[in-house]
């Protein structure tokens, strides 16, 4: 393991990383508290509130755990093998839940917006039940592929060893043989391709439905639709932003992870992976909050009243 890795990350990445974690914890806390507040106030919940609230809770737990693990980036905590395996596996587990929750949300939106004539309409009455089973199954499948962490993660005993892949000052990964590396790379590629492909298909299906609906409405009314976006259009745009950002970050993370197995001990790759791995959990709640009319409309109304009051006082 290259000791320059810790020095490089400590010098250039520490402030940025903790700033990213802090923003993510704040954003996910606001999103989760907003849904809890709406539930307590007795507002009728939307069908997507549960998946979004679950995703915010998962991201919050993942970022809190990442913040605790991050302390070991810059000051050794003296963890043993069991502690290293537990923390690293839990972090990967929450990342798996994050991916599965995003996939579940995209599929859920597709089922909600599909017309009654669609084959997917038969899943509407029991969609929460089916999606809960789907989420549990995909989480187990997704996490099982990362189960090698329970073997590969060990406590770092020798700081000068060049055969270990650096994680934190207390923990490292044992190097894998070429055959095992190819096997896990294939499984990881299949796992990511399946979930990203499923999200892409659901998003394209919703976009097609909305385009058909818009064309049909224009023909019936013989006039242009109102420029104001409908709730369905806002939902599809939010999901498109989700999908695009998730796809970009997943691609970057996969490339960096594969590059680290080739260029072991490269500090710049490791520091980049730290930031990329948590970027989706930081940005996604802000995308939801910015497109949440139940939050933005009262804030806009409050701002307009304040501006009007200032104008009258002036």
Curated annotation (Swiss-Prot):
Extracellular domain ranges by topology: 1-19, 71-92, 155-186, 257-268
Cited InterPro entries: GPCR_Rhodpsn_7TM, Vmron_rcpt_1
Subcellular location: Cell membrane
GO MF term list: pheromone receptor activity
Highest taxon in the source lineage: Eukaryota
Coiled-coil segments on the chain, per record: none
Keywords assigned: Cell membrane, Disulfide bond, G-protein coupled receptor, Glycoprotein, Membrane, Pheromone response, Receptor, Transducer, Transmembrane, Transmembrane helix
Listed GO CC annotations: plasma membrane
Gene3D superfamilies the record matches: Rhodopsin 7-helix transmembrane proteins (1.20.1070.10)
Predominant location: membrane
Disulfide bond in keyword set: yes
GO process terms (BP): response to pheromone; sensory perception of chemical stimulus
Ranges facing Cytoplasmic side: 41-49, 114-133, 208-235, 290-314
UniProt membrane topology term: Multi-pass membrane protein
Residues listed as glycosylation sites in the UniProt record: 158
Family assignment from sequence similarity: Belongs to the G-protein coupled receptor 1 family.
Function: Putative pheromone receptor implicated in the regulation of social as well as reproductive behavior.
PANTHER family linked: VOMERONASAL TYPE-1 RECEPTOR
Protein name (record): Vomeronasal type-1 receptor 98
Taxonomic lineage: Eukaryota, Metazoa, Chordata, Craniata, Vertebrata
């Amino acid at each position: 393991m290259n000791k320059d890795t810790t020095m490089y990350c400590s010098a250039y990445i520490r402030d940025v990383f903790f700033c990213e974690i802090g923003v993510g914890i704040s954003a996910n806390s606001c999103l989760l508290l907003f849904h809890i507040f709406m539930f307590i106030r007795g507002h009728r919940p939307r069908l997507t509130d549960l998946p979004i609230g679950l995703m915010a809770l998962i991201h919050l737990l993942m970022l809190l755990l990442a913040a605790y693990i991050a302390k070991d980036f810059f000051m050794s905590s003296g963890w043993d093998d069991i502690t290293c395996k537990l923390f690293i596996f839990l972090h990967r587990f929450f990342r798996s839940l994050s991916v599965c929750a995003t996939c579940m949300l995209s599929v859920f939106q597709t089922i909600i917006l599909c017309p009654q004539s669609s084959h997917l309409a038969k899943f509407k009455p029991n969609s929460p039940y089916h999606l809960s089973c789907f989420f549990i199954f995909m989480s187990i499948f997704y996490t099982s592929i990362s189960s090698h962490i329970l073997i590969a993660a060990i406590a770092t005993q020798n700081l000068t060893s060049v055969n270990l892949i650096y994680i934190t000052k207390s923990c490292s990964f044992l190097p894998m043989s070429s055959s095992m590396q190819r096997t896990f790379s294939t499984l990881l590629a299949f796992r990511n391709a399946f979930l990203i492909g499923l999200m892409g298909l659901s998003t394209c299906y919703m976009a097609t439905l909305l385009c058909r609906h818009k064309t049909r409405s224009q023909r019936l009314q013989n006039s242009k639709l109102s420029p104001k976006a409908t709730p369905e259009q806002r939902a599809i745009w939010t999901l498109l932003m989700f999908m695009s950002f998730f796809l970009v970050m997943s691609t970057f993370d996969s490339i960096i992870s594969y590059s680290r197995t080739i260029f072991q001990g490269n500090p710049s790759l490791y520091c980049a992976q730290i930031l990329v791995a948590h970027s989706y959990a930081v940005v996604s709640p802000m995308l939801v909050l910015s497109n949440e009319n139940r939050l933005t409309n009262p804030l806009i109304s409050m701002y307009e009243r304040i501006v009007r009051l200032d104008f009258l006082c002036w």
